[in-house]
C-alpha cells in the first residue's frame, strides 16, 4: 500500500 499517507492516529495502520 501507500505508506506515509496516513494521519498519525493510535493504532492506525497504513496498508
UniProtKB/Swiss-Prot annotation:
Tissue and organ distribution: Expressed by the venom gland.
Which cellular component terms (GO) are annotated to the entry?
extracellular region
The superkingdom listed in its UniProt entry is: Eukaryota
Alphabetical UniProt keywords: Secreted
Q: Where in the cell is it found?
A: Secreted
* Protein's name in the database: Peptide 4913
Q: In which organism is this protein found?
A: Tityus stigmurus
Classification of source organism:
Eukaryota, Metazoa, Ecdysozoa, Arthropoda, Chelicerata
